[in-house]
């Protein structure tokens, strides 16, 4: 039998159950609201990624940047090592990282302060330098003119180099040999001189030195001493200078290169007087015995020299330069020869001098008038490693001439040109 008390208890239980159901509904509702708040729509499309996916993307980006940075650093290090291996003379490069790319910046040119050595090509990575020594290997405390020195190029890592071209004041003087790695050098003038070492046109090192006036060399004894009164020149250098100083040059004879032309001119003294004012650029026309007509601007004279080499080895003369004057002091011409090998003993050498036709006409008229006509020669032989060997002498300018069939005209003045 259902009593009121039973009904009351049932209502209480139902109320409690309803409250529990409502409580459960309130707990789930905020999750839906939270999703709606984080899900904005734009034209019906979702523009925001879920929170978990966004966090994952952030982590991926950071990992990617870190990986890319590590990769770029390794790439830079590998590139730096590769550059140094492939180019030992190439200067170090500074790289600036921007978005994975590298911009190269050349380093400043290498300069060794206090040694006046500069690499003008921003190369090399090593400090090459130029060294000047005496032939015995000692380093002089000063550089003097007319002295023999050896030039070397030194690599601090491997030592002396070979095959490097050496220039002094822009003039090529030689290439470092493969045996000793040296080039002989003589400074002929005092003052500042710049030595450069080049490899295939690239300047490896440069050195500027001051060359002092040389001390006169006397009887094979050096007059250069160090602070302890010791002679610092080697015996080899003294012997070399002594040998070169003993080389002598003599004027042996002067003769026409073509004696027929001289005879032809001597037979026409009036003609010789008439050409006194003619410029040698125009010349004169002469008909030879065989009917050949030539335009004569100069008359060539051969100056025969004797060069005495008392040494046991041959010596190469770089060049011989001489000037010819007549006995009245008039300049007649200049001659030059180069690259002459002088063997031990006496060596005949001929230097040709071209005398303008109007000046030669004057000298022939003097000779026909009975005067003694001499040529005075002054010149120098330039020998590598020893400097200048001066010489002088005189000889008859003309051979005996035939008496012309015509009276001699008055002697004109010496042509100005």
UniProtKB/Swiss-Prot annotation:
Signal peptide: none
Keyword Lipoprotein attributed: no
UniProt subcellular location: Cell membrane
Compositional bias annotation for Polar residues: 86-106
Spans annotated as Disordered: 84-106
Cellular component terms (Gene Ontology): plasma membrane
Domain of life: Archaea
Membrane topology term: Multi-pass membrane protein
Membrane-crossing segments per the record: 10-30, 148-168
Primary localization class, coarse: membrane
Record's keyword terms, sorted: Cell membrane, Membrane, Transmembrane, Transmembrane helix
Gene3D superfamilies assigned: 2.60.40.1820
Protein name according to UniProt: Uncharacterized protein MJ0943
Naturally occurring in which organism (per UniProt): Methanocaldococcus jannaschii (strain ATCC 43067 / DSM 2661 / JAL-1 / JCM 10045 / NBRC 100440) (Methanococcus jannaschii)
């Amino acid at each position: 039998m259902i009593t009121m008390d039973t009904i009351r208890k049932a209502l209480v239980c139902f109320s409690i159950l309803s409250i529990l159901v409502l409580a459960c509904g309130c707990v789930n509702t905020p999750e839906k609201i939270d999703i709606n708040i984080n899900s904005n729509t734009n034209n019906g499309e979702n523009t925001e990624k879920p929170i978990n996916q966004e966090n994952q993307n952030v982590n991926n980006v950071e990992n990617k940047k870190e990986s890319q940075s590590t990769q770029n650093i390794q790439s830079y290090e590998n590139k730096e090592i590769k550059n140094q291996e492939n180019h030992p003379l190439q200067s170090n490069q500074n790289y600036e990282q921007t978005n994975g790319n590298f911009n190269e910046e050349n380093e400043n040119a290498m300069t060794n302060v206090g040694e006046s050595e500069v690499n003008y090509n921003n190369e090399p990575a090593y400090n090459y330098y130029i060294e000047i020594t005496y032939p015995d290997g000692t380093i002089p405390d000063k550089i003097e003119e007319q002295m023999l020195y050896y030039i070397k190029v030194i690599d601090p890592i491997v030592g002396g180099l070979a095959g490097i071209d050496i220039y002094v004041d822009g003039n090529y003087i030689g290439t470092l040999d493969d045996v000793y790695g040296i080039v002989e050098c003589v400074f002929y003038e005092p003052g500042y001189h710049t030595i450069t070492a080049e490899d295939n046109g690239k300047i490896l090192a440069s050195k500027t030195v001051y060359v002092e006036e040389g001390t006169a060399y006397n009887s094979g004894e050096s007059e250069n001493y160090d602070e302890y009164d010791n002679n610092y020149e080697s015996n080899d250098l003294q012997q070399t200078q002594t040998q070169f100083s003993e080389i002598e040059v003599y004027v042996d004879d002067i003769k026409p290169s073509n004696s027929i032309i001289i005879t032809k001119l001597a037979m026409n003294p009036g003609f010789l007087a008439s050409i006194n004012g003619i410029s040698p650029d125009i010349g004169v026309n002469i008909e030879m015995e065989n009917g050949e007509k030539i335009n004569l601007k100069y008359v060539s004279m051969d100056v025969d020299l004797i060069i005495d080499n008392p040494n046991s080895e041959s010596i190469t003369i770089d060049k011989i330069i001489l000037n010819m004057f007549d006995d009245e002091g008039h300049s007649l011409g200049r001659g030059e020869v180069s690259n002459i090998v002088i063997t031990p003993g006496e060596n005949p050498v001929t230097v040709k001098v071209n005398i303008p036709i109007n000046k030669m006409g004057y000298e022939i008229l003097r000779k026909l008038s009975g005067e003694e006509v001499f040529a005075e020669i002054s010149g120098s032989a330039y020998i590598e490693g020893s400097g200048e060997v001066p010489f002088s002498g005189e000889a008859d300018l003309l051979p005996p001439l035939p008496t012309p069939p015509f009276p001699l005209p008055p002697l004109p003045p010496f042509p100005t040109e």
